[in-house]
Swiss-Prot record:
Pfam families: Ribosomal_S16 (PF00886). GO terms for molecular function: structural constituent of ribosome. This is Small ribosomal subunit protein bS16. One of its GO terms (cellular component) is cytoplasm. It comes from the Bacteria.
Amino acid sequence: MVTIRLARGGAKKRPFYQVVVTDSRSPRDGRFIERVGFFNPIATGKAEALRLDLDRIEHWIGLGATVSDRVSTLIKDAKKVA
C-alpha cells in the first residue's frame, strides 16, 4: 500500500521533515517513491515552514494512496494559505 507521510531529517533537537510518497512497509526514513514537499516545525523569521506540491499529492490520492494524520493536517493548512 502506498502512503504519504513524513520522513525525519535534520540534526538532533532540530527536526526537519520531508513529505514523501512511500510504500507503507518501508522504514520511516528509508526508501521513498517521490518527495512532494517539506515541513520545518521550527522555522523562524522569513524561513519557509511548509511547502507542498498539492497537484502531485492529489494525483497520488487519486491513485489510492493513504495520507497520515499529520500530513492531512499539513495539507489543510497549505490549502488555507493558497
